């Protein structure tokens, strides 16, 4: 069938550190609200990192029955909740759809560390015969897509992409390709994560990837010269992607159009992006080429922007490499300045942000940004902007050199 089918966004859902719906999340974004605070899940007395961006007031009973909730770890509960919101928002009635043409592409970078920690303790204390029989289906990352498909009767292609911090963006991009090539008419797509656990925080701390700041206002400060690591977040964002004519036939509202997807691999280092930015630059240019958009037509990028020294520097180099002098005309922001780094869900949350920015003509500021260093000399949005956003490019860069960019545009007939 080729790549000639247009793909639009018709529904969105979000469980985030600043709100448990798209409306709450977006209002928080416009207010410059941050979700950072002391870790409450465990005692951090022996940890250098004491801050995280936890989801607040989440009640799985609002989205599923008790039996289902017990058979899911939190990363799956977040995904099922956000997917339910998105499907409801889209007005998608599965009884009216061919279930084999409605698929699922929901990824998690890590799966459930909670289940692994809990059952490992049981193994050490009581022996191998006492390890719970549900450990494996509870912890493996593909159960996010599995549980979403089970919960909503999605019988089409079901994917679980695992590309670390690029998971959410790859998941949406692969769902987009699935619809383009005619393998589905509708895809439920996004990412989810819940890794604020003792081993999760200890592991990322050992990498020196996390901020050790105890001041929530100076913990996640992408592109600032005082940046010292990311703040771990959690949550999920899910979107309904739909073939345009299918959406029009059922009278669906259309938020925006997904029009380009680009990927690359740095083939450079297990944690660091390529220093020259060439891999990320290639992903961005591939997304623009896929969407038929010239680099100089783009005005806005939602950056990966993690608040680590290397990422923000190397992503800046990538933008300059891809856009040349036009890089200085771009507005670039980081949603992680408010919600932290949601790992496998980060790209999906930032995708929802881009949809809302296109819809409302608003580019949010990078909260906490005060002063940059010499090589970081682009416009990283110290202030918000109210202006037309015809296109939005969002980047995700994952451990292992996984790069993904997707291009959205304002929907026009």
Language-model region placement:
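Active-site-adjacent elements of ketosynthase-type condensing enzymes
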Residues: 45-54, 111-115, 194-220, 262-282, ...
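A glycine- and small-aliphatic-rich helix-loop capping segment at beta-alpha/alpha-beta transitions
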Residues: 23-28, 114-128, 178-181, 201-214, ...
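Conserved beta-ketoacyl condensing-enzyme motif
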Residues: 9, 25, 30-163, 192-201, ...
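Condensing-enzyme catalytic core mediating Claisen C-C bond formation in acyl metabolism
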Residues: 6-10, 37, 215-291, 300, ...
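Glycine-/small-residue-rich "gating" segment that lines the acyl/pantetheine channel
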Residues: 125-132, 170-173, 177, 193-249, ...
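Short, well-ordered amphipathic alpha-helical segments that serve as non-catalytic structural scaffolds
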Residues: 79-90, 144, 171, 242-244, ...
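Active-site-proximal alpha-helical scaffold in enzymes
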Residues: 79-92, 141-145, 149-193, 231-252, ...
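ACP-dependent fatty acid/polyketide chain-elongation machinery
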Residues: 1-68, 245-257, 352-366, 409-413
